[in-house]
Amino acid sequence: MLTNQSIGYIDAPIPKGLDLKEEINRMRREKNAVILAHYYQTGDIQDIADFVGDSLALAQQAAKTTADIIVFCGVHFMGETAKVLCPDKKVLVPDLNAGCSLADSCPAVDFAEFVKQHPGHVVISYVNTTAAVKAVTDVVVTSTNARQIVESFPEDTKIIFGPDRNLGNYINGITGRKMVLWDGACHVHEQFSLEKILELKKQYPDAEVITHPECKQPIVQVSDFVGSTAALLKHTVKSVSYTHLRAHETGAYL
């Protein structure tokens, strides 16, 4: 039972002598559970997970799992997405207060009104949204497939894109589209400073600047590579550059 609503999880002491990893593994077997962890999680959580990935990869794993219980170590909208894909399975989010500032920047009631103000538009939403926003959406995309989905529509198609204005601006720039953008953003990616990136580039002139498209356009424009979390990881492994200046979350590179 959740006794402290402010922290979103049961704050109980671990019994003395209990091996936490062994206990997690025992319960996982007994309950036929699968643990999915986002790249943003800390290393100890990633180590215990059955699968680690970005939003798209974890959604795909959730959709094909044979487990009865999905333990989703991610933010609230990710658990919702897993439940939508697997309505007959029990989906658990370890911390009920694990929120996403980007999803929070797009209240469903306000977004529905925004859609009404733009009749005749196809509504494309980034996966980082609540289930209520997805309910008024025609197509849900990830940063991995957003460009492909947008380009699948005829060029004269009127499109609303939400909630991330930075990702929307990036897609507009590389596709030549003029999508109508909802004015939302991730507070983490908003904090990256162009001035700081340029300062670090002077210190490490041989470093590659690699960026997630949720960053502001000035940072994207000076980047050597822009991509989803999975794409950034793959690029880092294959890159000939030894040093990378990364404008993204920290957990993905533990």
Label each PLM-derived region with a short phrase.
Residues 45, 59, 78-81, 111, ...:
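Short, well-ordered alpha-helical microsegments
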